Amino acid sequence: MQTSHSISEKICLTCGLCCNGVIFADVQLQNGDSAERLKALGLPLVLRRKSRAVVSVPPGETSGPRHQFPQPCSAFDGCQCQIYPERPTHCRAFECALLKSVQRGQTKPSGAIRTIEKARRQAGKVRELLRQLGDNDEQMALSLRFRKTSKRLQEGEIDEHTADTFSQLTLAAHDLNLVLSEKFYPGPA
């Protein structure tokens, strides 16, 4: 018999949407997180500014909520976190709505896996359409890539094929956002 911990672990390891840039664009460090240690572990930390502009973390800056790192997370290998025992507080605390639904017995694990697979397929479709439109930056969160591509295409003249691909992208991104907001992350309470 599987324990609730092993079921949760299986779901999280199957998913990874909170680490791979699909749900979040960045992760803000919390009080108590050691920026210095996380940087040594390979996270590309930046200072968060009020304007959302960021700069590299200077030596000597060690902790606090002023730091963040971009998604997709550089410690995520596609299946699991490579710094799991020392991951930031926000990562330790986050549980998506789908996982909570399984833990409460409202969703069967098999149903959760199907939902994850659907979301991953939809994210893959968005990535493919972004590539077709010239955006190959796999190190940037999906939402940021979509905004960057949208802005670029809206500012210039585009041919009919590009317009058709962009309309497909817009619909695919909308469908992905629906799945994410309904099943994974309805937003801050």
Stretches found by the model and what they are:
Residues M1-A189:
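Hydrophobic scaffolds flanking metal-cofactor catalytic centers in soluble metalloenzymes
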